[in-house]
């Protein structure tokens, strides 16, 4: 590719020093937990992706090494190796000075992800050690850093090479990442696979060299976002082949791919310069506006909508739609709303996407007449269903107080005394007997109890109007009081935490899954905000002695049980809990409800695409994918009820025996 290489020493601009990064890492990577740890990798990978995005290189390799460090290698141009205007080697400037990156000069990149340039130095500052190896101009150069970014060597020429590119290896600092410095293959694979879908020329290889965890995955999609849509819709009944539109407008490149399926919810994923905009923005608005306008015009042209009929709503048109919107915006036009860069603010992007879709979609609808007519009819059906559900939703919102009173009068909800919605907790408890113990054992100031008596509907396969007919779900909607579906407003929630408390058996697990499916599909902001939890009652109670000498201990896993048995010695009584109802109110409070001693699992969505696919696989209509997934992931043994804590894949995100973060 014959391009002028303007990625030179003087195109790197220096803005400020690095001192603040180690003091306040959260300002730069969001957090110092598992999420922040993996963010370090994305920062380096995004620099390599920017090279590919601008036409240099086509391969990135990410390797988790045996010692727990990680290497990211690309075949781009290689970082500049000369002396910077400040008098230091340019590579050293890139890795030791905040905001020293190609993005900030005009010569380096035409388009790049929003954080490019900050990445390298922040990663260095938060690493125990870092090593960079550069292949450029026929030479290999290396430089080492230690103790959070201090140069251990200068930039040294170490050999000859015929290739170009950059390799960065680093080990995260355990003083910063106190909870974990262990990389998770699956978390990395989700983000890397996404990048490969968005850049069809790019091949990404992810390798794990750690003992007992060895594996490798390669991501390379020649059809790009077309394959991305197929991936998201896997396991669903699709109504047509994936459709793609591409075009330019206002200097912005637009790529759109979409496909309808037989489900009732929409899934729109948008990206700017290969970075996910999870909160949408102007590009999504442009897509939705054009789609709604073109569909309504077409529906009137084929006489499915008469003059007296009102226009179809965008939500109705998008029912069952999966779409990927990818835009590439020149650096000078790039604007985000807020600090997180998760919502695009560039106004030109709206008109760019609108004009590309408005130009191409009418031709597509005309060409696929039969399909288009069925999609219009599908939208009209959705409109009718929405009207039916609207009344129920209005009851849920405008009649909130009356309904809440009705719920109280019907004896279901035992409310908290406090009106402090920032502190109040709602326990959804399986069955009446456990609900009774929970009512007596709770802290009535801030804990409310809602026993679930009947059958919870599988919301993956149901329309909203049917969901409102399910008494258990309806009661939950009214109790939380923040609406449902597209009307859900997290700020209206009556509770800061929703805690699901069920027996530790297969029925309990099934209820958990049904409730989580509902929250994921119809109250997603609650899950995204980390406000849905699963309570973890103990599996065993051990008792020894009598009267004043009586000792009572609880165990949550077989390992804990073994340790307690050794500690207590002989002569103890062991009780295996089969259900919550076997505990008296004091025991339930002490083990499962007391913020000082309880253990909660916070339900978190790391990757919405994969979570959504998993929900479809496990809760959808198709039996074969479900059987295949269960055979691959579930081990059937002789143990009747194994603790969830024994599963190494489940992360206990909040063990409140040790930490309890209260909002005052």
Curated annotation (Swiss-Prot):
Which cofactors is this protein said to need? Mg(2+); Mn(2+); Ca(2+)
Q: Where does Mg(2+) 2 bind?
A: 503, 505
What residues bind ATP, as annotated?
Answer: 7, 47, 74, 114-120, 341
Question: What Enzyme Commission number(s) apply to this enzyme?
Answer: 5.6.2.2
Q: Where is this region: Disordered?
A: 386-418
Q: Residue ranges of the Toprim domain?
A: 424-538
Q: Which GO terms describe its molecular function?
A: ATP binding; DNA binding; DNA negative supercoiling activity; metal ion binding
Q: Which residues form a coiled coil?
A: none
Q: Which Pfam families match?
A: DNA_gyraseB, DNA_gyraseB_C, HATPase_c, Toprim
Sorted alphabetically, which CDD domains does this protein's record hold? HATPase_GyrB-like (cd16928), TopoII_Trans_DNA_gyrase (cd00822)
InterPro entries linked: DNA_gyrase_B_C, HATPase_C_sf, ParE_type2, Ribosomal_Su5_D2-typ_SF, Ribsml_uS5_D2-typ_fold_subgr, Topo_IIA, Topo_IIA-like_dom_sf, Topo_IIA_B
Gene Ontology cellular-component annotations: chromosome
Q: How is the cofactor bound?
A: Binds two Mg(2+) per subunit. The magnesium ions form salt bridges with both the protein and the DNA. Can also accept other divalent metal cations, such as Mn(2+) or Ca(2+).
Q: Which reaction does it catalyse?
A: ATP-dependent breakage, passage and rejoining of double-stranded DNA
Q: Which family does it belong to?
A: Belongs to the type II topoisomerase family. ParE type 2 subfamily.
Its quaternary organisation is: Heterotetramer composed of ParC and ParE.
Name under which the protein is recorded: DNA topoisomerase 4 subunit B
């Amino acid at each position: 590719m014959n391009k002028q290489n303007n990625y030179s020493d003087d195109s790197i601009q220096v803005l400020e020093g690095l001192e603040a990064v180690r003091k306040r890492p959260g300002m730069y990577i969001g957090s110092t937990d598992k999420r922040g740890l993996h963010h370090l990798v994305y920062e380096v990978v995004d620099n390599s992706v920017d090279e590919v995005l601008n036409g240099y290189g086509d391969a990135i390799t990410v390797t988790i090494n045996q010692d727990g460090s990680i290497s990211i290698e690309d075949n781009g141009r290689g970082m500049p190796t000369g002396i910077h205007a400040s008098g230091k080697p340019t590579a050293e400037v890139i890795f030791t000075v905040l905001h020293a990156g190609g993005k900030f000069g005009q010569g380096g990149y035409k388009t790049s992800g929003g954080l490019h340039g900050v990445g390298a130095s922040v990663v260095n500052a938060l690493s125990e050690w870092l090593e960079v190896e550069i292949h450029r101009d026929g030479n290999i150069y290396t430089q080492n850093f230690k103790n959070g970014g201090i140069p251990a060597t200068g930039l040294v020429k170490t050999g000859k090479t015929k290739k170009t590119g950059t390799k960065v290896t680093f080990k995260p600092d355990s003083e910063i990442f106190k909870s974990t410095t262990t990389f998770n293959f699956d978390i990395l694979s989700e983000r890397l696979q996404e990048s490969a879908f968005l850049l069809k020329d790019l091949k990404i290889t992810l390798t794990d060299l750690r003992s007992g965890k060895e594996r490798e995955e390669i991501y390379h999609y020649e059809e790009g976002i077309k394959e991305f849509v197929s991936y998201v819709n896997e396991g669903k009944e699709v109504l047509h082949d994936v459709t793609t539109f591409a075009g330019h407008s206002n200097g912005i490149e637009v790529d759109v791919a979409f496909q309808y399926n037989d489900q009732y919810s929409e899934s729109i994923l948008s990206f700017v310069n290969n970075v996910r905009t999870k909160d949408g923005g102007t590009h999504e608005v442009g897509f939705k506006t054009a789609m709604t306008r073109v569909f309504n015009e077409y529906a009137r042209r084929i006489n499915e909508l008469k003059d007296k009929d009102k226009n179809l709503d965008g939500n109705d048109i998008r029912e069952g739609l999966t779409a990927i919107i990818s835009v590439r915006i020149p650096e000078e036009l790039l604007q985000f709303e807020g600090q997180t860069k998760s919502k695009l603010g560039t106004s030109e992007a709206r008109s760019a996407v609108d004009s590309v879709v408005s130009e191409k979609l009418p031709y597509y609808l005309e060409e696929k007449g039969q399909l288009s007519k069925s999609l219009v009819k599908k939208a009209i059906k959705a409109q009718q269903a929405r009207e039916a559900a609207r009344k129920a939703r209005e009851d849920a919102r405008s009649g909130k107080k009356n309904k809440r009173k009705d719920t109280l009068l019907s004896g279901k909800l035992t409310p908290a005394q406090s009106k402090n919605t920032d502190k109040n907790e709602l326990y959804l408890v399986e069955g009446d007997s456990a609900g009774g113990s929970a009512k007596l054992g709770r802290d009535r100031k801030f804990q409310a109890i809602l026993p679930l008596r009947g059958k919870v509907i599988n919301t993956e396969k149901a329309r909203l109007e049917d969901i409102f007919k399910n008494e258990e779900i309806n009661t939950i909607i009214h109790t939380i009081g923040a609406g449902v579906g597209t009307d859900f407003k997290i700020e209206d929630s009556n509770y800061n935490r929703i805690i699901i408390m069920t027996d530790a058996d297969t029925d309990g697990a099934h209820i958990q899954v049904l409730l989580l499916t509902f929250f994921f599909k119809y109250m997603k902001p609650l899950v995204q905000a980390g406000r849905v939890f699963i309570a973890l009652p103990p599996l065993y109670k051990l008792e020894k002695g009598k009267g004043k000498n009586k000792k009572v201990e609880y165990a949550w896993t077989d390992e804990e049980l073994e340790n307690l048995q050794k500690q207590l010695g002989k002569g103890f009584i062991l009780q295996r809990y089969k259900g919550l109802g076997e505990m008296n109110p004091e025991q339930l409070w002490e083990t499962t409800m007391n913020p000082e001693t309880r253990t909660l699992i916070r339900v978190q969505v790391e990757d919405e695409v994969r979570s959504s696919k998993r929900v479809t696989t496990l809760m959808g209509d198709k039996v074969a994918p479900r059987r295949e997934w269960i055979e691959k992931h579930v081990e059937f043994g002789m143990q009747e009820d194994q603790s969830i804590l024994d599963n190494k894949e489940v992360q206990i995100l909040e063990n409140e025996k040790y930490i309890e973060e209260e909002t005052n």
